[in-house]
């Protein structure tokens, strides 16, 4: 892990491997650890994996005064890429609300992105926002109880033992109260209007795109979210065995799809 200081935030970043860069953006309420089963396979395949914790999420810091909504997250991700001084444009693979960040990055500066992979991502105002409403309203004074509650709810989020184990591990941090406060703040930062406003822009101008989906995703179903999202980008939709937390359920399948897609892109000039 490395710590990268930007103008107004400090990011916790897992950066491993050599080769074509893949920027990995996770979804709520996980962290860079969502990609722990994917990154070794990408490294073995000759790729560089860059998995940051979003600002104010996970172990990345952001002052309380700052808006940590997805538009600012997109700005910080570009600043991170600038700081890393990459030799070529990255492919972005993004899950859940990480896909909102990726879509905003495309809308802001599509020429800086070589390719886009959206994994069980958000589409327009379909953010499964109902699942986080109770977290938004949680009393910060009782934050220390939140992670215990979420730990008991992981079975409702996924039938997969792999997802349940991974989610419990990500929620079982040493400083429970601080972690819970970050989760509450993250939930409060979610605003589906940010992706509704850029739909037509994305339809007109975007890099080559692949959409990956878990066949049993109960939060963002493939029929109502995955297919419209793929249609927006004119992208192939590939369905893999697993649920919403596909990188935990099917890490080898996700890594193989990322590798195949990245190798299919035209070479950088």
Language model feature labels by segment:
Residues 14-59:
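Conserved HGGG/HGGXW glycine-rich cap/lid loop of the alpha/beta-hydrolase fold
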Residues 25-27, 95, 213:
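The conserved beta1-alpha1 loop
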Residues 51-93, 256:
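Active-site loop/oxyanion-hole signature of alpha/beta-hydrolase fold enzymes
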Residues 94, 98, 102:
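Gly/Ala-rich beta-loop-alpha elbow adjacent to hydrolase catalytic centers
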Residues 107, 114-145:
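Flexible "cap/lid" loop of the alpha/beta hydrolase fold
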Residues 127-128, 147-204:
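Conserved alpha/beta-hydrolase catalytic His-Asp/Glu region
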Residues 205-242:
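Conserved loop-alpha-helix segment in the C-terminal half of the alpha/beta-hydrolase fold
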Residues 233-269:
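Catalytic active-site module of serine/aspartate enzymes centered on a nucleophile-bearing elbow/loop
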